[in-house]
């Protein structure tokens, strides 16, 4: 038996591929319901506003590629800072889509398309990988569901760069298939997909790179033990080109972030920050509050977590049962099953981060010496790699039960078949959750009339996400900005404009070079009281004040 499972004989039939694509899309549409009814007017958001930020980021990348590709890092936000795109997670892979359409309306539709595509590709990638290691269609379906709809992913639905993980299993499928079939084109395609996955950010990219490195080491050891068998020249060339492409893109993408750490010391993740986000063992027993089946049941465990959004790692009961069965499935080689179980345990352990004393001892070493490891802000997202292993084992578990139907006869066989289909449905239902839809507020007329650079008030992390999203309309320079870093510049700016319009804040903004301040009354706690006091102070300072809709526009200069 092959050490990595019986290879799929020949190409997968076109009918199966067509059914796979349609089925994966249908599952994604149903799981995200009713998003399909609101593609142009709502965003899936858990309340933190991250989709607003990613919508803008995709649009900015495309805008910069067309207008000033060499200045892509200098966005229209965080004015007057430069190189500020690295304050965000890298997310370039979907940017070409933003070449179609412009403005906030197109940004919403584009984001929702990517959101639906993420779930679709995750299922397809895991399905194909499961088929390649020797599972039948039913086992591959279970693997696809267990990966794309793992319960822990529900709280990550607002993080498009986390749920866009389908490139991981798809890469493994293409590489495994390519090397087995000695098809250089598939091998190169695997490395291209790996590079694309890296382009979606280091959140998954770093752990994925280490996975590929570990697999490479295992392959080299196997090759040496096998007596150094001859490798076809086309495979060597495809591998070399692929590695250069993957490494080259990774280095190019990483350089601005490495330079940022030299420029801003606060850009490096601290162990205190990692400790805050690290889950304890209780994270494995806590499902998202939005989980339809397990949210309420696991609430007592979830309430003990510091930051549940990043610490709910519940794998699902059906997954646990199927993984246990799959670990002893004779249809897969023992070596492969051992590798999958070992990978699951190791990556699951690392996902605890600084959450336990044992995991801290290991994670701290990686944090200090492993290149790039200190950039991982939330260790729980390492569950992506754990889920690759658990999904394949879960698929093997269902395949084992499916194959055992041969021992049934008469009426019991259809009953057994129905029971396994029901189990597959339960596996999927365990990973379903409610993701609230957020309707983006329309771009205020005041922004269209204001002269940039603009400061929007009030300002905080939530408000600034909306202002950044609004700036997709024309990309005016704005002083506001929000990213994944807790920048001292941003803290000081927000503190200094808290009393606007007063002498100190106006003087600071004029020195900064801001030309317009827009105060959005609907975002103030007591707009009437604020407006009355602000009007008097603005008059004393000689500021030009205009009411435009539900916004107040202040001109800071006379030019």
What residue ranges belong to the model's regions?
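Membrane-interface coil-to-helix junctions
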Residues: 27-122, 146, 150-165, 275-303, ...
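Signature aromatic-anchored transmembrane alpha helix within multi-pass, membrane-resident enzymes
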Residues: 239-247, 392, 397-430
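Membrane-interface helix-loop-helix junctions at transmembrane boundaries of multi-pass membrane enzymes
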Residues: 12, 224-239, 323-362, 405-413
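Membrane-helix boundary/interfacial segments in multi-pass membrane proteins
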Residues: 44-47, 155-162, 300-311, 346-389, ...
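Membrane-embedded helix bundles of polyisoprenyl
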Residues: 24-28, 115-133, 137-223, 239-252, ...
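Extracytoplasmic
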Residues: 262, 266-275, 402, 422-559
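Start-transfer (signal-anchor) and selected internal transmembrane alpha helices
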Residues: 1-35, 236-244, 328, 332-343, ...
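Hydrophobic alpha-helical membrane-interfacial segments at the cytosolic entry of transmembrane helices
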Residues: 16-25, 193, 216, 229-255, ...
């Amino acid at each position: 038996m092959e050490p990595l499972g019986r290879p799929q004989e020949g190409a997968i039939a076109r009918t199966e591929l067509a059914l796979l694509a349609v089925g994966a899309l249908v599952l994604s549409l149903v799981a995200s319901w009713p998003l399909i009814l609101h593609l142009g007017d709502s965003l899936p958001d858990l309340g933190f506003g991250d989709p607003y930020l990613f919508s803008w980021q995709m649009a900015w990348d495309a805008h910069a590629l067309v207008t000033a590709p060499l200045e892509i890092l200098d966005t229209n936000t965080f004015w007057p800072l430069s190189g500020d795109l690295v304050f965000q997670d890298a997310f370039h892979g979907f940017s070409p889509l933003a070449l179609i359409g412009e403005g906030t309306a197109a940004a919403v539709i584009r984001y929702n398309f990517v959101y639906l595509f993420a779930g679709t590709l995750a299922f397809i990638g895991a399905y194909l990988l499961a088929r390649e290691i020797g599972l039948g269609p039913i086992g591959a379906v279970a693997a696809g569901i267990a990966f794309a709809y793992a319960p822990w992913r529900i709280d990550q639905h607002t993080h498009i760069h986390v749920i866009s993980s389908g490139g991981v299993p798809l890469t493994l499928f293409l590489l495994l298939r390519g090397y087995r079939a000695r098809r250089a084109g598939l091998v190169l395609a695997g490395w291209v997909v790996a590079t694309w996955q890296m382009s979606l950010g280091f959140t998954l990219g770093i752990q994925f790179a280490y996975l590929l490195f570990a697999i490479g080491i295992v392959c080299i050891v196997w090759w040496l033990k096998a007596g150094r068998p001859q490798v076809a020249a086309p495979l060597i060339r495809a591998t070399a080109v692929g590695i250069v492409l993957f490494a080259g893109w990774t280095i190019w993408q990483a350089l601005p972030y490495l330079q940022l750490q030299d420029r801003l010391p606060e850009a490096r993740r601290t162990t205190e920050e990692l400790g805050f986000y690290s889950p304890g063992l209780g994270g494995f027993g806590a499902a998202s509050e939005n989980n339809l089946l397990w949210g309420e049941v696991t609430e007592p465990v979830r309430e003990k977590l510091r930051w549940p959004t990043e610490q709910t790692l519940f794998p699902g009961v059906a997954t646990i049962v199927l993984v246990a069965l799959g670990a002893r499935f004779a249809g897969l080689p023992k070596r492969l099953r051992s590798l999958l179980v070992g990978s699951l345990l190791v990556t699951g352990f690392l996902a605890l981060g600084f959450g336990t004393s044992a995991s801290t001892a290991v994670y701290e070493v990686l944090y200090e010496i492993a290149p790039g490891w200190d950039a991982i802000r939330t260790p729980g997202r390492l569950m992506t790699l754990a889920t690759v292993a658990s999904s394949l084992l879960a698929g093997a578990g269902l395949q084992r039960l499916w194959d055992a139907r041969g021992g049934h006869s008469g009426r019991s066989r259809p009953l057994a078949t129905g029971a396994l289909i029901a189990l597959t449905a339960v596996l999927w239902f365990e990973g379903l959750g409610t993701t609230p839809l957020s309707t983006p507020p329309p771009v205020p007329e005041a922004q269209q009339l204001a002269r940039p650079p603009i400061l929007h008030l009030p300002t905080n992390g939530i408000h600034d996400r909306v202002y950044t999203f609004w700036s997709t309309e024309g990309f005016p320079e704005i002083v506001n900005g929000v990213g994944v870093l807790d920048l001292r510049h941003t803290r000081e700016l927000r503190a200094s404009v808290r009393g606007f319009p007063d002498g100190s804040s106006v003087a600071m903004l004029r020195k900064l070079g801001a030309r317009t301040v827009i105060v959005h009354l609907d975002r103030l706690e007591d707009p009437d009281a604020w407006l009355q006091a602000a009007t008097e102070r603005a008059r004393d300072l000689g500021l030009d004040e205009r009411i435009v809709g539900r916004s107040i526009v202040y001109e800071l200069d006379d030019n």
